[in-house]
Amino acid sequence: MKKLWLALAGMVLAFSASAADFSDGKQYATLDKPVPQSPQVLEFFSFYCPHCYQFAQVYHIPDAIQKALPADAKLTKYHVDFLGELGKELTQAWAVAIALGVEDKVSPLMFDAVQKTQTVKQPQDIRQVFVAAGVKAEDYDSALNSFVVKSLVAQQEKAAADLQLRGVPAVFVNGKYMIKSDGLDTSSMDNYVKQYADVVKFLLSQK
């Protein structure tokens, strides 16, 4: 657990910072080429990524971010297709989850199936995870190749390309800033999670 924590945090020296101390190049980076049409707060992840598992399932950073956001803001999550044998299929499946509004039900089960039990070996196994999450098999099947899902897949791929994504987990704000996890307070897990959410909230307020 300690090794995973250090890896996620970037293995940097601990320090504390208030919002006034947040600065470009430390806790966040300003993109050279902003993407104005990007969702307000956008997280990229992969069900194959061990750090993404820790990010979401152990430290619950996405939950902390969502709770810190103003009422009119939302955290959007996109899956990437460049990791793992079934990366493209899982990106398509995540589009199904978005279309059906079952992201929160599917995410923990899919992370466990891919990384813990390692029971996702073929596309049919992905379908079974959705069924275990309470989605009717016929609903999954009809959504899988729908226009809406195809559009969502293209949307995820385009966002990753436009933002020149290099790795996951990654969080972008207003298509202009990227959170730098190696510049956050690592004195404790709680401080790290809180500051991650605070930086996102701070960046949302920037013009």
From Swiss-Prot:
Pfam families, per this entry? DSBA
Query: What GO cellular-component annotations does this UniProt entry give?
Result: periplasmic space
What InterPro entries does the entry give? DSBA-like_thioredoxin_dom, DsbA/DsbL, Thiol_disulfide_DsbA, Thioredoxin-like_sf, Thioredoxin_CS, Thioredoxin_domain
Q: What is its main location?
A: periplasm
Q: Gene3D superfamilies, per this entry?
A: Glutaredoxin
Signal peptide per UniProt = 1-19
> Where is this gene product found?
Periplasm
- What does the record give as the function of this protein? Required for disulfide bond formation in some periplasmic proteins such as PhoA or OmpA. Acts by transferring its disulfide bond to other proteins and is reduced in the process. DsbA is reoxidized by DsbB. It is required for pilus biogenesis.
Q: What is this protein called?
A: Thiol:disulfide interchange protein DsbA
Q: Which gene encodes it?
A: dsbA
